């Protein structure tokens, strides 16, 4: 069996670094690829920055290379193994760039002003590894995730490394990594690529555009999103380029770690475990969640949860506007939130909690164990979104029998089965949640009210919970798709569609 060496390049991977779904998706994918999906032997190694505390988390760290001439200064590559999975990881260490309180933003929520250099350095490190470093075999495939790694395909292409194929996965097209064009030289972008058909867009360097332009193949994380991003409404200005790459663009849906998100064996539930065949402890999880968050201890309450970045994309503004009327109209309704994001939205949510003490609980920040307890104890998950590449959070909720009330966009169209009008006649069918159109408070209010009516019918509620908990959202099928894609890339001859300038990378000085 031929082994396909794959370098996975990303800004996040759980548990080393995580701010949202990207960290979960990267780690889940890499772990699943280690099980020889479809009989393909994939040897994955992860490349990511050595953020503050990351080096302390890996096992047996040792420096394996030193890299000079990177944007932001010299760095070292430290190899270690991730806790739990044993996954091999290369950490790019440059304390001046990465030893900071946050991954992307400072304590005030502002993005670091040198983020362009921080993630250009990551891409250059990937390109050096693709060239081959002493004692480190070059990969057959470099798999870059989102804008943070998206310069890697350009650099590999420009260096003439035609034997190394590149794959870019778009997790969120809205975040493109745009920076002033005058930084192009400092970022090590070759002169031949500094144009509107290359790395530039509207007089800015656009990391994600560069990746889409120069990657051998491009994937997105859901079928619906792959269709949506070809349109002006969802293409974020890149729909034309994506349509031009249409033959090389394909969806590979995400999965979730079903061992980590498993109510029957979750260590974060304090022994209150349950499954689709015996859900009695879910009520106990609700009582425990109410006590933990300061909600009224009512067994008859319906807990509506929200676990999300607090941004306009996630319709946090709409939820804030919709919730008062919902709480006033449904006296048994309670609301619990975990999230952080835009300061104005955080302030508005704190004010909502103060207005409805005992019925509204707001936890600003992210707490992984609490997130598990939130999904276990809630009845419904509110997950509005103006666009949604995939939507991992509804899948976590469904694993715990918490039914999502979500926008009918992106990946949620593929993963959530709405029972339709039949639910009003006490027929759950194959339903696993509730989808709604629109982005007005009234749209969200009507959807939540519809879900509350369904939950008031025990037979419907129980059937939908079982459907949700028994749905297969594992990485198995996705890992097979990626492994097959790697195999086709590794065996493919060099294509001549895009002329490749053979320019040197930044000096590989020690």
Curated annotation (Swiss-Prot):
Pathway: Glycan biosynthesis; glycogen biosynthesis. Synthesizes alpha-1,4-glucan chains using ADP-glucose. HAMAP family: Glycogen_synth (MF_00484). It comes from Bordetella parapertussis (strain 12822 / ATCC BAA-587 / NCTC 13253). This is Glycogen synthase. Its EC number is 2.4.1.21. Transmembrane segments: none annotated. Belongs to the glycosyltransferase 1 family. Bacterial/plant glycogen synthase subfamily. Pfam families: Glyco_transf_5 (PF08323), Glycos_transf_1 (PF00534). The keyword Glycosyltransferase applies. GO terms for molecular function: alpha-1,4-glucan glucosyltransferase (ADP-glucose donor) activity; alpha-1,4-glucan glucosyltransferase (UDP-glucose donor) activity.
